[in-house]
Design a protein with these regions (language model features):
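Glycan-processing catalytic domains of CAZymes
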Residues: 21-358, 363-387
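Sec-dependent N-terminal signal peptides
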Residues: 5-14
C-alpha cells in the first residue's frame, strides 16, 4: 500500500464507530462551517441525511465545540473543530477533546499568509506531540488570491515547513456574470499545480465545491456564486476527483439548509444527489493513483495539457463535442480506469469513443457493458470506463 493510501486509510479509520461506519469505505464528504452550534442537535441529523460524513465547525469557545461534537457523535458525523483555546491553551484544549468519538482533526487556520508559517508550524508540532492520532487541518488560498505566478512557491513553502498529513485548498470556479455562467480561468491551473505538489510530497489533497449562493466582495475581486445546479456541482466535484482529491468539502452547510429555521432548502436534494454519486464512484477514486490528466476542446484551460494522442492503448478514438472534456487515466487496486468529464456545466456534450478489446463502464449502478460508442454527457457529468 502506498504512503498516500496509508494516510487516507488512517484518517478514515478514525471514524469507525461514529462518523464513518459503512460496509465500504467511501470518499469522505465534509460540510465547511455554516452550522450554528446552538442548533447542532437538529442540524447534524440533517447533515447525515444529506450524505455528509464530516463537518468543519468554527466555534467561539472550547465549551461550544465540545457541545457540538456531542451532537455530531449522536448523529454519526465526525468533526474538525476550531476554537480559540486550541491556540491559546493548546495542551489543555487537546486533552479536552483528543478522545472524543467525533474528533477527526484539529482546525488550525483557514487561508493563512506566508508569514503565518512559523507559528502554524509550532502549533502543528505541539498538537501532534500531544495527539499523534488526529491530524491537523490547514486550508490554503486559491491561486488567484495568492499571487498566481508565485503560487507554487507559496504552497511548496507550506508543504516543506509544516508536515501536515494532507493538504487542502479552496477555489470556487462557477460564477455568474450578466445572467450567464462564467468559469474562473484560474481553476484548472490551480488543480494542476496543487495536485502536482501533493504528489511530489506523497500525500493526499482535499478540494472544494461551492454550495452557498452569495456575492463575494472586497477585498476580493467581486463575484457572484449562483444557486448551484447539479451540473455546477458535478463539474466542481468530478474535476476535483479526476485530479485525485481524496476528500470533497462543501462551502457551506448553509447551502443545503436554512440554519435559522432548520428547514431544508430546495438545493438540499441537489447536494444529496451529488453526495450519493460521490459515494457510488468511490471504488474508482478513493486511494487512486492519477496517471495523467488531459483536456480536449478548441480552447483548453490555462496551464493544462491537450490530449494529443490516445490516453491508453485500448482507446482507438475519442472525441467530445462542445466546450471539451477533462480526461483522466487512473489506477486503483490493480485496475485501470479512464474517466471523461464534460467541461460544460450548462450544456450537454456528445462523447464518441471506440475501444480495442473488452472494456466495461463503471456507473453509479455498478459495472455495465458498453452498448454504444456514442453517448451523451449531461452538464458537468462523467463517464468512467474500466479498461
Amino acid at each position: 500500500m502506498n504512503k498516500k493510501l496509508l494516510i487516507i486509510s488512517a484518517i478514515l479509520a478514525l471514524c469507525c464507530g461514529c462518523a464513518h461506519t459503512t460496509e465500504q469505505e467511501t470518499i469522505p464528504i465534509l460540510s465547511w462551517a455554516g452550522m450554528p452550534a446552538d442548533k447542532a442537535d437538529v442540524l447534524f441529523p440533517l447533515a447525515k441525511e444529506c450524505g455528509f460524513d464530516w463537518h468543519l465547525g468554527l466555534y467561539k469557545s472550547q465549551e461550544m465545540a465540545i457541545s457540538a461534537m456531542d451532537a455530531a457523535a449522536k448523529a454519526g458525523i465526525g468533526v474538525i473543530p476550531g476554537f480559540p483555546e486550541l491556540k491559546d491553551s493548546t495542551e489543555k484544549a487537546v486533552a479536552a477533546i483528543k478522545d472524543h468519538p467525533a474528533l477527526i482533526a484539529y482546525h488550525l487556520k483557514d487561508e493563512p499568509e506566508t508569514w503565518d508559517v512559523d507559528w502554524l508550524k509550532e502549533m502543528h508540532d505541539n498538537i501532534q506531540a500531544l495527539d499523534s492520532t488526529h491530524p491537523c487541518y490547514i486550508n490554503l488560498y486559491p491561486n488567484w488570491a495568492w499571487n498566481e505566478e508565485k503560487y507554487v512557491e507559496h504552497i511548496e513553502l507550506y508543504a516543506n515547513e509544516i508536515d501536515t498529513e494532507f493538504y487542502s485548498f479552496d477555489q470556487y470556479p462557477v460564477t455568474e456574470v450578466d445572467g450567464g455562467i462564467v468559469i474562473r480561468p484560474t481553476w484548472y491551473r490551480n488543480l494542476e499545480e496543487f495536485s502536482a505538489m501533493a504528489k511530489r510530497h506523497g500525500k493526499p489533497f482535499w478540494a472544494f465545491a461551492m454550495a452557498w449562493s452569495h456575492h463575494l466582495g472586497a477585498p476580493s475581486p467581486p463575484a457572484f456564486y449562483p444557486i448551484p445546479t447539479l451540473g455546477h456541482l458535478r463539474l466542481q466535484v468530478f474535476s476535483d476527483l479526476l485530479y485525485g482529491a481524496q476528500v470533497i468539502q462543501y462551502f457551506t452547510f448553509g447551502g443545503a439548509v436554512d440554519t435559522k429555521t432548520c428547514q431544508k432548502k430546495p438545493e438540499f436534494e441537489t447536494i444529496q444527489q451529488m453526495n450519493s454519486e460521490i459515494k457510488a464512484y468511490s471504488p474508482v477514486f478513493l486511494g487512486c493513483d492519477v496517471q495523467d490528466v488531459w483536456h480536449t476542446g478548441d480552447a483548453i484551460p490555462s496551464h493544462t495539457r491537450r490530449l494529443e494522442a490516445m490516453p491508453h492503448k485500448k482507446v482507438k478514438s475519442l472525441s467530445v463535442s462542445g466546450e471539451g472534456a477533462v480526461v483522466s487515466l487512473l489506477e486503483n487496486d490493480g485496475k485501470t480506469y479512464l474517466a471523461i468529464l464534460n467541461r460544460d456545466c450548462v450544456n450537454e456534450a456528445e462523447l464518441d469513443i471506440d475501444f480495442c478489446g473488452r472494456v466495461r463502464m463503471f456507473t453509479v449502478d455498478g459495472i455495465k457493458r458498453v452498448k454504444s460508442n456514442k453517448m451523451t454527457l449531461s452538464p458537468g457529468n462523467i463517464t468512467i470506463f474500466k479498461l
